[in-house]
A protein has these predicted regions:
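GST-like fold's C-terminal all-alpha helical module
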Residues: 94-193
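GST-like domain detector, emphasizing the conserved glutathione-binding G-site
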Residues: 1-124, 176
């Protein structure tokens, strides 16, 4: 989700980076001590400092490399862009997790992929890690986030309405805020990654 958002931005901005597939050992022994959490994306800068959380990461990277910036200069447009980014990051998370972890074909594919990635080079079995991640993601990010059979239709409708509005907005422009990508485009991309 957020790794896709960050990687899309890094590619767009032409920022040299090395994408590292993490396993449980890297998460535990490197990422956790450096960031305080066992989550990706996380990025180590050339000066040794670590960054986490895509919103502040992209703000910092944009200040260092952003020519042109992905943030609107006009204060009102800037505020709206941040508001819409927050919506895409925080509200479209639910439908994204719902579609990834609520359906057998989706969670089967993802549990196999995550099991392979997280166990690669470790002593842990891929199948076990895959099943762990499947249930962790479902229980934490679907069920515990409030998605239940009685409100699945609302989650589906939220995503459908959002896609319809994006399609309408993009009929006369290549990007959501105009002629070039902005933070808004990258935020919406996360839920579709």
């Amino acid at each position: 989700y957020y790794s896709g958002k960050l990687e899309a931005y890094l590619r767009y901005a032409g920022i040299d980076h090395e994408r590292i597939e993490v396993n449980t050992d890297i998460l535990r022994d490197t990422v956790l001590p450096a960031t305080g959490v066992m989550k990706v994306p996380a990025m180590q800068c050339p000066d040794g400092r670590w960054l986490k959380d895509t919103t502040p990461m992209m703000r910092w990277l944009d200040q260092q490399h952003g020519k042109p910036s992905i943030y609107p200069r006009d204060p009102a447009s800037h505020f709206i862009a941040l508001l819409v980014e927050d919506y895409a990051d925080e509200w479209l998370w639910r439908p994204a997790m719902y579609y990834r972890w609520n359906f057998a074909d989706s969670h089967r594919l993802l549990r196999h992929r995550l099991g392979r990635e997280l166990s690669d080079g470790t002593r842990y079995p891929a199948a076990g890690l895959g099943w762990f991640m499947r249930w962790r993601q479902y229980l934490t990010f679907v069920r515990d986030d409030g998605i239940r059979p009685h409100n699945e239709a609302q989650v589906q409708a939220l995503y459908g309405r959002t896609l319809a509005q994006l399609s309408q907005r993009l009929q006369d422009r290549p990007f959501l805020l105009g002629e070039r990508p902005s933070i808004v485009d990258f935020a919406f991309f996360a839920s579709m990654f």
